[in-house]
Amino acid sequence: MRFTSIEAVALTAVSLASADELAYSPPYYPSPWANGQGDWAEAYQRAVDIVSQMTLAEKVNLTTGTGWELELCVGQTGGVPRLGIPGMCAQDSPLGVRDSDYNSAFPAGVNVAATWDKNLAYLRGQAMGQEFSDKGADIQLGPAAGPLGRSPDGGRNWEGFSPDPALSGVLFAETIKGIQDAGVVATAKHYIAYEQEHFRQAPEAQGYGFNITESGSANLDDKTMHELYLWPFADAIRAGAGAVMCSYNQINNSYGCQNSYTLNKLLKAELGFQGFVMSDWAAHHAGVSGALAGLDMSMPGDVDYDSGTSYWGTNLTISVLNGTVPQWRVDDMAVRIMAAYYKVGRDRLWTPPNFSSWTRDEYGFKYYYVSEGPYEKVNQFVNVQRNHSELIRRIGADSTVLLKNDGALPLTGKERLVALIGEDAGSNPYGANGCSDRGCDNGTLAMGWGSGTANFPYLVTPEQAISNEVLKNKNGVFTATDNWAIDQIEALAKTASVSLVFVNADSGEGYINVDGNLGDRRNLTLWRNGDNVIKAAASNCNNTIVIIHSVGPVLVNEWYDNPNVTAILWGGLPGQESGNSLADVLYGRVNPGAKSPFTWGKTREAYQDYLYTEPNNGNGAPQEDFVEGVFIDYRGFDKRNETPIYEFGYGLSYTTFNYSNLQVEVLSAPAYEPASGETEAAPTFGEVGNASDYLYPDGLQRITKFIYPWLNSTDLEASSGDASYGQDASDYLPEGATDGSAQPILPAGGGAGGNPRLYDELIRVSVTIKNTGKVAGDEVPQLYVSLGGPNEPKIVLRQFERITLQPSKETQWSTTLTRRDLANWNVETQDWEITSYPKMVFAGSSSRKLPLRASLPTVH
């Protein structure tokens, strides 16, 4: 079954088309132009002032990458040297500077989610931003809230935060603030509904033997889009994100980087996005269509990697000269790019890139792939780590979730013989960076694989850190790190005072195949014989502690309730300080306060199967129908009355907490008013000129395959090299696509993140929390709301806070619920509304431990 339209879903019921119909994404034109609203005003005006001085070719130069593997960064635009504007360096990844050296390898986004700590999210973002800035990168290609985590086995879930949109949204926003406060443009990605690696790109899928010709299509209804997948991006826009990266997949059978509904309507018109939309690498599929649908920057610039051809560059210049793309659209692209640059203060901090993404050699050709240009110093080996190892270690410890503890932890340091068991305890025999883009599972797992990685400056393994602890106390430590040497594992476990067993499960981006996992995991089991390693140790040692390093949930049902398994910890993907972070928790220097950012089911079937791994549409685009709507992770478990092993939000401590005294207070707030009125007409800046103004400059030494904005000839058809050049634009351009007249403001729009009235605080909720144990510890009070409708989740997370309490001390935690927190999306009015269904609020320590509840008063 396939959805007929993103708007064709009633508020309380999904309307499905017949099986032979494909989902359809309705057109929305024209592409909204930036207006500098809110705190963008100063940056917008500066951008207008500089863009007004640019020629058409100079504007185009800002919009188009110069080509894959040509300049130093993984993506680099042209600049405007005449006006002192450099080409902009865009660099991966969401957890650190990729393809570089002397940089930090931070914990992954999923670990930040496990901290439930807004301040740590900000500090991590700020620290990463500092390192990107110091390396000469202007744009960080992160953070990610797409994938959100529709399927627990989605390959890149770990790059983002959590399948809960509220938790993801808050930490997404804080990360963006941190990055941009360090003077680097943050890129909110991957927009949108990019939830699996299978079929994300047709050429990649063809390489794996799948006979498809188009990327897979994520098919979802408007309610699901707004209440789940768009939610964290609204938080990102409200936080001032300078860039948004559109994704590889199609959304309702329209590619993410030329989908006018998701880019023009949702992102720019409804959420009021003022920055620029950048394509993911090779996700740009059409020149004019992409420009008019809201794409602002093409990366890495070429049609295919290293092809030397581009949908934009020269072709965008031609499209403006012949009137196919209006001047106001390319002006808007340039203004958006420059406004983001100015908003973060990049002009004050700019430094040229001091590293090469393509080689670690000190010297090389300036234009790497074609071995052209001067032979010069391309790597300056600048150490940008500062003191970030301290923060990384803290986040690693504060994100370690204690899932089970039968009195085994914390360790006392007096254990006479400690057994370290499992490959995940030790080093990769090829070195921490021995597998390209971490594309293997050898040794301890501290990040997944793909473009969302960074080189480790070092990696402290659990074996190193724990051995240091044991030897410091003059006790014995022995290792068994061959996961198939079961006899040796059993023999060692028999002699141990405590057996620490290390297991893992990996995943990553689809261009790398690890043990038959094409990015997405094939299943949720532990890798490399992990279950048998645990059972071998536990059958011979009555004090077996299991440590899991994984990209998400794994199946623990075979051994979690074994009485000899006395403790279980999830360490996630903790980055370079992995072993030290874990030792801090094991030995009680840090009291665990982390909470699971996802649900641990008893079986893979408990999650339902949302991952499409076989083509289902002939050789056309595989159709990925999001038939579950908003019911993913704990929402789906609740709906199906499925009992998890460990619920969303669950996590133990070395102390205990008590919740009491829930109070609810209605706050004074303005009435909700749908936004109304019209925009100004699209402004233009400067003159376009004639084709003769944009011929290649005399004396230019052209670089092979480099993407330029200039023309070979004043004959535009000859300059384009397009066999279909001259086709009447009215034959293929949607109605209104080039209309620069004033446009109506959407009811749900009018401000950053949507209608400003959505963020009015309507209700204050307070709870008393007491530390009833004997040691200080962190707790994360969680506030859930029931929206009351018959087809709504039983509860949805809305607020949380990580707090520290000394023993026997208590505090009153107070938070507020906004209009958005209490509203549903109405597909008929195309606006948010607080329904008349009775609503309740719940408070507690996890999604299934909510001792306090109260009815909410009626608000509007």
Swiss-Prot record:
GO terms of molecular function: beta-glucosidase activity; glucosidase activity
Entry keyword annotation includes Secreted: yes
Locations listed in the record: Secreted
Pathway(s) where this gene product acts: Glycan metabolism; cellulose degradation
Active site: D280
InterPro entries on file: Cellulose_deg_GH3, Fn3-like, Glyco_hydro_3_AS, Glyco_hydro_3_C, Glyco_hydro_3_C_sf, Glyco_hydro_3_N, Glyco_hydro_3_N_sf, Glycoside_hydrolase_SF
Glycosylation sites: N61, N211, N252, N315, N322, N354, N387, N442, N523, N542, N564, N658, N690, N712
Keywords, comma-separated and alphabetical: Carbohydrate metabolism, Cellulose degradation, Glycoprotein, Glycosidase, Hydrolase, Polysaccharide degradation, Secreted, Signal
Pfam families: Fn3-like, Glyco_hydro_3, Glyco_hydro_3_C
Signal peptide stretch: 1-19
EC number(s) on file: 3.2.1.21
Main location: secreted
GO BP term, pick one: carbohydrate catabolic process
GO cellular component: extracellular region
Catalytic activity: Hydrolysis of terminal, non-reducing beta-D-glucosyl residues with release of beta-D-glucose
Keyword Ribosomal protein in record: no
Entry function: Beta-glucosidases are one of a number of cellulolytic enzymes involved in the degradation of cellulosic biomass. Catalyzes the last step releasing glucose from the inhibitory cellobiose.
Similarity comment text for this entry: Belongs to the glycosyl hydrolase 3 family.
Official protein name in the record: Probable beta-glucosidase A
Species for this entry: Aspergillus niger (strain ATCC MYA-4892 / CBS 513.88 / FGSC A1513)
